[in-house]
Amino acid sequence: MGVGCSVTITMNVVTSYTIGIIGGGQLARMMHQAAIGLGVRTRLLASDPDESAAQVMSDVVVGSHLDHDAVMNFAAGCDVVTFDHEHVPTVLVEEMEQAGYAVRPGSAAMVHAQDKVVMREFMAREGFPNPAWKVCDTPDDLVSFGNGHGWPAIAKTSRGGYDGKGVFKIDGPDGVGEPFDAAGGLADGKQPIRILAEEFVDFRRELSAVVVRSPSGQGAAYPVTETIQRHGVCAETISPAPDLSSDRQVELQTMALDIAGRLDVVGVLAVELMEREDGSVVVNELATRPHNTAHWTIDGTETSQFENHMRAVLNLPLGSPALTAPVVVMANVLGGSEEDLTGALQHCFARDPELRVELYGKSVRPGRKVGHVTCLGNDIEITRRRAHHAAAYLMGEHDA
């Protein structure tokens, strides 16, 4: 155990290491699936024994990612620790490192996904594309920002938000109190919650540049993906992003790899982008873990983001991110009226034998990510229709 963790091979047999995953969601579940093929043991810290990953893993510790003793005791039983989410307090990640545990990604990288203000400061300092932004200490500061940059303005809590939570579109001075009220509800006394104001970017679409980086500095870049959001949640991805030239693909991939290198990221880094009408982009958010916008890589590339994340964590050479089809479309299954997901598969598979489905073992409730479907093809619109039908049917829309 320790910071030098890497897989060794003796007489053609991989010496098995234990990767600890903090967080029991579907990302951990799919990391575990990737680790099986590598002959690597996984250990899970989950808040509930019925969480998605806990259902399929044998070595499960039930405990909170906010509990100091639970996290430190868990790390002691692992060769290297990685994450299903960014919600472990930064101070706890730092303490694991100080105790000599191998943590990948490390706290210095991960904080840029945990704290939006820290991320914006880094982007500005390093010259990456930011929207206009300002840290607001008071509602009056937010009024001043909106008056200066125009309404509507976007206000975000610096920590605690995901899938559109913690993000507020403020139409005018009368609405500036809401984000400050939300920040008060998120405060835990351990980490400051600040309000970040950003200009409202009138973007034409959202893109995602997902890369992987190993401790030795090797990088791999997946094709840039167009993402379609509904109610702040990713509903669909199209890969590679349509109407994006090869040169522009390379530029955005290179930028994402550059960010990963400067932050010393180990594992997956997702760079969420907003593309304006003129083709320019600004960085929206970062994620230092496998990402929903790259679930399509399980079936649509030679090496999935999950396997490459596991490889990076173990300092193994990274696998090829090359496409396995000209067009790959993923559609999320967002909980609807269909409770018998297994029964619905009979229709979906009979209709489309090439359909790929991942269900996460989660109970169904409106808007909740309970799975995704992936379709590979040659024509964008035909492939999208296939994915839309399957996802809609699994959500209970049987007339789709």
Task: Annotate the PLM regions.
Residues 132, 152-154, 193-198, 269-270, ...:
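A short linear hydrophobic-aromatic micro-motif
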Residues 5-7, 11, 311-400:
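Peripheral (often C-terminal) accessory segments that flank ATP-dependent C-N-forming ligase machineries
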Residues 250-271, 277, 287-336:
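Active-site "cap" helix and flanking loop/linker of ATP-utilizing ligase/carboxylase catalytic domains
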Residues 4-121, 140:
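ATP-binding N-terminal substructure of ATP-dependent carboxylate-amine bond-forming enzymes
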Residues 220-223, 269, 281-285:
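Protein kinase-like catalytic core scaffold
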Residues 212-214, 274-276, 360:
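Short beta-strand micro-motifs enriched in acidic
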Residues 112-208, 212-259:
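Active-site nucleotide/adenylate-binding loops and adjacent lid/helix of ATP-dependent enzymes
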